[in-house]
Amino acid sequence: IVNNDTEDRLLTGADFDPESFVQAADGTFWVGEEFGPYILHVDKDGTLLDAPYAYPDVKSPSNPTLGAEEEPNLRNSKGFEAMATDGRYLYPIFEGYLDEATDKRVRVISQFDTETGKYTGKTWDYLAEDDDALIGDAFLTKDGRLLMLERDDFRGSEAQLKKVFEVKDFADAKAGSTLQKDLMANLLNIANPGKIGMVSDARAYGVGDPFQFALLSVETIIQLEDGRYLTALDNNFPGDDGRYRGKPDDTEMITFSVK
């Protein structure tokens, strides 16, 4: 973008595809994106503070530095959809598998040091439910659990995978290891004894007991201060219609508890 008030061309969505956001203690933001994939560091106004941090030896077809004779090794839109943090360190996670992966369920988790601005070289392997499962988001809880949101690319009655898993020992997990995960919540089978939405949205898909978050791009999982969890939808407006067929999905957010 260039206009009479700009000295240089402004960065836009044609340059980067921001997907995951982490706010640092100083109020700045770290952003995971998918074109590079890169990690970006911006201030509270969105001004880029450092040159984009490239991931070593991985490039998507949309990477601007990809040479004419160079082969990409990560599919488009399979970069850093998810990124967790424990404060100093970021944990960007590939949404899909790397092209050279022998087991295409593996989703690589890496560690990035915000103080040095470098990847530490530590990685962990997380096994998704199947080759095509997508990592929608990740979150590190205060007690050291890594929450991983897995989803498929379907909506409504066709949706089969919208689940939150937890890695209970991530804080102590050895680098280079394959992580052990446990199911925390099936978002297609949420108990709804309070009948939330059953009167106001009686014709909507998945509104009942159990409640189903059977929407396409479920891409948020966080734990709230009171212990509940929040998940949310990227509605890809106006393309998705998981709740009412033929009607663009709203941006839905729901909170739930785990007993």
Residue ranges and their predicted role:
Residues 1-259:
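Sequence/structural signature of beta-propeller domains
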